[in-house]
């Protein structure tokens, strides 16, 4: 009995160490990518931003500062003439929750023309948003907009898909309640990103994606609208 307990204990410790080691590897691997917060460092040769979605409200109903910062960053790039269009990609899990529609609404209220905004309601996860940016919208060198840690994760995914993306980091809220939660969340999200890239390929249904690409007019609309 003692031998069984000891063996179980050692296996549990080994499992925890392997899990922690894999987590650290994933975190550092993703963290090797770089972003910028400086609009002047963004060249004008990139025509599209990929704006990654999140809820516009926190639990309790207060405005989400992460969401507001992403919208403001997208507007800054557009008004500085760095981008011609924005792909607002997020979760539209049901008719009562539609991240892309909210982003489009707030972007237009901030002065971005509605004609410059494309929405992707199937960006359920970061991997989905990035691969759909490439394969559905035909954009292979976007400026990815989100907070720094999220941008790095998206850049890692984009790089694995052969895309030449750059990251424009929206300001990250500094309150301790956000810092602790997001550090923990990002640790696990980066592990999932590495698994997505190397094993599962996200939640994308490849057959459905290829069918959508074949039937989609997004790319041709973009070409007509922005001369790409």
How would you label these PLM feature ranges?
Residues 2-40:
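N-terminal type II signal-anchor transmembrane helix
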Residues 4, 47, 212-215:
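Positively charged, low-complexity intrinsically disordered regions
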Residues 24-183:
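A structural signal for short, hydrophobic/glycine-enriched beta-strand patches
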Residues 13-14, 77, 192, 197:
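Enrichment for repetitive, rod-forming helical segments
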Residues 202-228:
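Short linear elements at protein peripheries
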Residues 93-98, 165-169, 188-196, 211-217:
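A general structural signal for short secondary-structure boundary/capping elements
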Residues 180-203:
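A transmembrane-helix-recognition feature enriched in membrane-embedded lipid enzymes
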């Amino acid at each position: 009995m003692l031998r069984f307990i000891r063996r179980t204990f050692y296996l549990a410790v080994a499992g925890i160490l392997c899990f922690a080691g894999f987590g650290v590897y994933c975190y550092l691997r993703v963290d090797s990518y770089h972003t910028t917060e400086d609009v002047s460092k963004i060249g004008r040769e990139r025509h599209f931003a990929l704006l990654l979605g999140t809820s516009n409200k926190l639990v309790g109903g207060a405005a989400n500062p992460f969401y507001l910062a992403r919208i403001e960053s997208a507007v800054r790039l557009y008004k500085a003439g760095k981008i011609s269009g924005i792909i607002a990609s997020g979760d539209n899990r049901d008719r009562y929750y539609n991240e892309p529609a909210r982003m489009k609404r707030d972007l237009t209220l901030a002065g971005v023309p509605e004609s410059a905004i494309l929405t992707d309601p199937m960006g359920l996860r970061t991997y989905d948003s990035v691969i759909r940016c490439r394969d559905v919208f035909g954009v292979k060198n976007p400026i990815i907009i989100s907070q720094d840690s999220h941008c790095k994760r998206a850049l890692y995914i984009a790089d694995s898909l052969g895309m030449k993306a750059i990251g424009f980091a929206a300001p990250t809220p500094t309150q301790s309640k956000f810092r602790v939660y997001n550090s923990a969340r990002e640790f696990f999200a980066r592990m999932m990103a590495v698994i997505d890239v190397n094993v599962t390929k996200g939640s994308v249904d490849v057959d459905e994606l290829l069918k959508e690409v074949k039937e989609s007019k997004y790319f041709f609309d973009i070409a007509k609208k922005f001369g790409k």
